[in-house]
Amino acid sequence: MRQLDLTECGPMSSQTQTTLSRLTPIKTRRFAFVLIENFSLLSFASAVDALRIANRMAETTLYTWLFMGEGGDTISCSAGTSFKLDGDLIELKRDDTIMLCGGINIQNHSSKKILNWIRREARRGLPIAGLCTGAYPMAKAGILDGKRATIHWENQDSFSEEFAEVDLTKSVFISDGMRMTTAGGTSSIDLMLKIIADDHGEELANAVADQMIYSSIRTDQDTQRLSVPTRIGVRHPKLSNVIQMMETNIEEPISPAILAKDVGMSTRQLERLFRRYLNRSP
């Protein structure tokens, strides 16, 4: 089990201290991180570190965690690094929270053993979250039927085709009852900050965000926003810049002549660029 060495704790603010003083006695909450082969290192590390920082800022052990996985030995993340696991897929305590850590090629790594384990723990009433592509084994196990969920944008189309019974959204994270899902990347931070706020108040969650230099905390109302080149399927710097300017000035549109001048081309060149790549005028 991973626990914080409290000798490493830094000071917390008097405001946070006052908030936590109203919470005694504090019950420690344990998270079981289930690492699935090729899991996203960013999504996983973001979630664990949010818990670590919460402990540090509170100067007490609010959270503990352990790392589990099929086989219980070692497992590789998306960066190719091997992680030593604390154990195999065991039966957990009823007040534990499960975090399924997915990554690339999740379809190939959602084994029958993992799916059966997910179903069993869901029947026992444990809250289960899927980080990055962790929503896939959750849906495959049937525990997202009729639930709202999200998944990384690369997997959205295939997921919606395979799991029509899941209400898929483009949100950065979703919390629907005992089921939680994230879109990957830093969206793990947003989910963990919500959990920390629900458990111990927004002051502590904000203190954790500040430590992570995370200035814009997102909610489940925020959607995955892709870059202009990804959305339009074209890697053309000037075209991307023009579209970005158009999107930020919807209420007061900029004329094509000014747009063209701002990116160093003529209006006619801009019109040709739009027709060539987007089959439309500016």
Where are these regions (language model features)?
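Structural detector of well-ordered beta-strand residues that form the stable sheet scaffold
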Residues: 128-129, 150, 169, 180
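Conserved anion/nucleotide-ligand pocket segment
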Residues: 171-213
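Residues at the C-termini of beta-strands that transition into short coil/loop
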Residues: 69-71, 87, 153, 172, ...
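Residues that mark the start of a beta-strand
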Residues: 28-30, 148, 178
